[in-house]
């Protein structure tokens, strides 16, 4: 019984287990993978030596984490792309609350002023508006 050759469709890509690049790896790719694995093992060993040091003082600094934190916080503008959505959301979050609070205060004062002019508001002990 022979099975038909698997053809990936638009909605269902080729599974990783059937990917020929998974098994037919060139020697250069294998060498690069081995180098990356060696670097990872060396960094892990250095971290564990620092972590398990009984005479450790202070924090252990992870350079990759420091780079990530720098890129995430202080280095925002080189990676920021202004778009219409960003601009609209900035204006909405910046001016929206101010306009909302202004509207609430204005309508409350207008309502109170109308009641004062009609004489329906009891202003006992009122020294200000």
Swiss-Prot record:
The chain crosses the membrane at residues 88-105. The keyword Oxidoreductase does not apply. Keywords: Acetylation, Electron transport, Membrane, Mitochondrion, Mitochondrion inner membrane, Phosphoprotein, Respiratory chain, Transmembrane, Transmembrane helix, Transport. Residues 1-26 are annotated as: Disordered. This is NADH dehydrogenase [ubiquinone] 1 beta subcomplex subunit 4. Belongs to the complex I NDUFB4 subunit family. It comes from Pongo pygmaeus (Bornean orangutan). The modification N-acetylserine is found at residue 2. Pfam families: NDUF_B4. One of its GO terms (cellular component) is respiratory chain complex I. Accessory subunit of the mitochondrial membrane respiratory chain NADH dehydrogenase (Complex I), that is believed not to be involved in catalysis. Complex I functions in the transfer of electrons from NADH to the respiratory chain. The immediate electron acceptor for the enzyme is believed to be ubiquinone. It is a single-pass membrane protein. Complex I is composed of 45 different subunits. Its main location: mitochondrion. The modification Phosphoserine is found at residue 26. InterPro entries: NADH_UbQ_OxRdtase_NDUFB4_su (IPR009866). It is found in: Mitochondrion inner membrane. Signal peptide: none annotated.
């Amino acid at each position: 019984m022979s099975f038909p050759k698997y053809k990936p469709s638009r909605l269902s890509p080729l599974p990783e287990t059937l990917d020929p690049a998974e098994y037919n790896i060139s020697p250069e790719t294998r060498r690069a993978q081995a180098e990356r694995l060696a670097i990872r093992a060396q960094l892990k060993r250095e971290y564990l030596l620092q972590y398990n040091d009984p005479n450790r003082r202070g924090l252990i600094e992870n350079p990759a984490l420091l780079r990530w934190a720098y890129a995430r916080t202080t280095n925002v503008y080189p990676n920021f792309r202004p778009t219409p959505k960003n601009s609209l959301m900035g204006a909405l979050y910046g001016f929206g609350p101010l306009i909302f609070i202004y509207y609430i205060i204005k309508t409350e004062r207008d309502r109170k002023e109308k009641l004062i002019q009609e004489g329906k508001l009891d202003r006992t002990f009122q020294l200000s508006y």
